[in-house]
Each structure stands twice: as structure tokens, then as C-alpha cells.
């Protein structure tokens, strides 16, 4: 099973110009019940849309409903950052602190035995989480 990183969800957005054919093809052959999100990904989508609304209001407004649509599409397949995930998250910061949201997503994937699907493999490599880069595969 897989946890999709924010960059994968963004790449799969309907109407995204110049979307990666490799990523879309990879996602198309996966059973939807094998694809999950971290709740942190929904946070990142919401933050991204809000930032875009400030920087480019027309584009941001056009995407305002998108994070909610992603949440509906993944209903029942969104994993929380839970009490049991927190200790694993803490260990990912020793000896080298990591970006909190990336470490939270990695800890969630590791707790469930899932692979992290991302383009940003460098951000996750040292965590020990299983990785898949659909841009490169």
C-alpha cells in the first residue's frame, strides 16, 4: 500500500497543464484501495491554496474547493497523525532534525508499513521509509 505525497496529488489534479504522463500512468494502474493520504497532505494542500489565493487570487480562487474534493475522493483512506505515530516521528529527528511535515508523513507511512510515493525522495531517504518515485520508475 502507498501514501501519496503532496506533489503526487498535485500532479494528478484534473486540468493540470503539463502533468507527468509517468505519474498518471502509475496511478491509473493502482487499485484505489491501495492508495492513501496522510492528513498532513490535506494540510499542505490547504496551505498551498491559501498561499496561492494571496499571491494570485484568480488561480487560488479556482483551486479553493480542490483540497475538499481530494478529501472526499480519499474518504476512508486518510491516515491521521496519531498518538502512536508521535514517538516514531520523534525518532526521525535524531540525530538530524527534518522538516516536520515530511517527517510526520514518513512516520505515518512507516507505522502502517506503507511506501511513500513522492518526487522528493531526497527529503525522505534518511528516514528509512520505503520510497517510490513514479517520475523515475
Model feature map: region roles:
Residues 39-40, 82, 120, 135:
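Residues at the C-termini of beta-strands that transition into short coil/loop
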Residues 1-37, 41, 51-69, 137:
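Short, well-structured N-terminal submotif of metal-dependent ribonuclease cores
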Residues 1, 106, 110-137:
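Acidic, PIN/NYN-like endoribonuclease modules and their adjacent C-terminal/linker elements
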Residues 9, 42-45, 86, 124:
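A generic structural signal for short hydrophobic patches within well-formed alpha-helices
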Residues 36, 79, 132:
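General small-molecule cofactor/ligand-binding pocket signal
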Residues 47-53, 61-64, 72-119:
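Active-site neighborhoods of divalent-metal-dependent phosphate/nucleic-acid chemistry enzymes
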Residues 5, 44, 102, 120-123:
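Acidic active-site catalytic centers that drive phospho-/nucleotidyl reactions
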Residues 11-12, 48, 88-92, 127, ...:
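Residues that scaffold the ATP/ADP-binding catalytic core of kinase and kinase-like folds
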